[in-house]
């Protein structure tokens, strides 16, 4: 079964947000068939960092990335998200 890799940037609502804790909050909200395979902290400006998330989702996800986007937006501490890339991967 093919899966989809979604690369997103998550912008926190404040520079004081602990990004490691934010990732844990996000993981706790994701369905069991969604998986964060990697995340990086990306400097933005003036001490503000964003998270670059690499999330594997099922290819059959209805609505493409919209469900993932809704979940990410619902997490406390997330100001904005941006989907950067979507790739189909055959094996994972």
From Swiss-Prot:
Q: Which SMART domains match?
A: EF1_GNE
Stated family: Belongs to the EF-1-beta/EF-1-delta family.
InterPro entries this protein is in?
eEF-1beta-like_sf (IPR036219), EF1B_bsu/dsu_GNE (IPR014038), Transl_elong_EF1B/ribsomal_bS6 (IPR014717), Transl_elong_EF1B_B_arc (IPR004542)
- Tell me which HAMAP family the record gives: EF1_beta (MF_00043)
Function per UniProt: Promotes the exchange of GDP for GTP in EF-1-alpha/GDP, thus allowing the regeneration of EF-1-alpha/GTP that could then be used to form the ternary complex EF-1-alpha/GTP/AAtRNA.
Xref: CDD domains: EF1B
Question: What GO molecular function annotation could you give as one example from this UniProt entry?
Answer: translation elongation factor activity
Name the NCBIfam families for this protein: aEF-1_beta, PRK00435.1
User: What protein name is recorded for this chain?
Assistant: Elongation factor 1-beta
What keyword terms does UniProt attach to this protein?
A: Elongation factor, Protein biosynthesis
> Which one Pfam family would you cite for this protein?
EF1_GNE
PANTHER family the record matches? ELONGATION FACTOR 1-BETA
Q: Which gene encodes it?
A: ef1b
